[in-house]
Amino acid sequence: ARIPADQKTRYHAAAVMASNLVVGLYDMAASELATCGFAPADAKAALAALFLGNARHIAEDGVEASLTGPAARGDQATIDAHLSCLSGDSREVYRLLTEVLYRIASRRATPYR
């Protein structure tokens, strides 16, 4: 696609979101697993399976079909429990991205089961 000159910065920001920011999320998740006692290699293996499976599902089926988990189910009790055990940047990122996930869930043709 040809990107208009006045949209190139937005295009680059979108690319950073889909690429570089995912690295930050992965690192935050690995840090939380380390707090749970995971060795770095075990955290890497656990997260790699989740990340690769999710990336494949998104690429093949889109975000609406790929969304699972508490936001997809409208499970606020689980989200609240997650937020209560997180702190700092991890808590804020979780909260902000959960709002995005709720918007994705609202676009589904059929509710998640």
Give residue spans per PLM region.
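Active-site-proximal helix-loop elements at catalytic-domain edges
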Residues: 33-40, 102-106
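Conserved Rossmann-fold dehydrogenase catalytic segment
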Residues: 1-18, 39-44
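Glycine-rich loops and low-complexity Gly/Arg-rich segments
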Residues: 2-3, 25-28, 96
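Short alpha-helical
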Residues: 8, 24, 77
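Membrane-targeting and insertion segments and their boundary/processing signals
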Residues: 3, 17, 21, 52-56
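N-terminal glycine-rich phosphate-binding loop for ADP-containing cofactors
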Residues: 21-37, 70
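Amphipathic, non-transmembrane alpha-helical scaffold segments
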Residues: 15-18, 22, 94, 98
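NAD(P)-dependent Rossmann-like dehydrogenase/reductase catalytic/cofactor-binding core
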Residues: 44-113
